[in-house]
Amino acid sequence: RSDPTQIEVKLFNRWSFDDVQLSDVSLIDYIGVVPSKHATYVPHTAGRYSVKRFRKAQCPIVERLTNSLMMHGRNNGKKLMAVRIIKHAMEIIHLLTDQNPIQVIVDAVVNSGPREDATRIGSAGVVRRQAVDISPLRRVNQAIYLLTTGAREAAFRNIKSIAECLADELINAAKGSSNSYAIKKKDEIERVAKANR
């Protein structure tokens, strides 16, 4: 990285990875900002992240968001479409906030991962809920899932494109505003867990 002859690789040739800060200490190992081996211009590294147990923690966070957009049968496997959505969403985020969109995405993921959840403990036919802490990797997974689900539901039967909805969702989640689907869900999950401690 320090070698001046090397070209600095930016995401979509616009957004720099270098000035991205992580506000949450516990998630530092689980939110990869730059791909581990070498930086890429697009959020597509074609890595086999499901081979080992925690391998997917090394997957760049923007790529995990991209992969999570390819949900609901009709979008399966359409990564080009997902990459295009992410690209548009990042441009919209930059226009609205004047921040590095990668930073906004990281903040959104940190803010929308629930910290505790209620699990079902059943013994002899009596099922009760018990509050449990959530591991850092599961927090990241939940956050990504909630963010993309919120964007997808907002864009469905709506004039706004999914890129605009995703941008709104990420900006609101990064601010911690309750207009965001992910933040609302996170609060709900934590509220249920608190009631079942």
From Swiss-Prot:
It comes from Cicer arietinum (Chickpea). GO terms for cellular component: small ribosomal subunit. GO terms for molecular function: RNA binding; structural constituent of ribosome. It comes from the Eukaryota. Keywords: Ribonucleoprotein, Ribosomal protein. Belongs to the universal ribosomal protein uS7 family. InterPro entries: Ribosomal_uS7, Ribosomal_uS7_CS, Ribosomal_uS7_dom, Ribosomal_uS7_dom_sf, Ribosomal_uS7_euk/arc. This is Small ribosomal subunit protein uS7. One of its GO terms (biological process) is translation. The keyword Ribonucleoprotein applies.
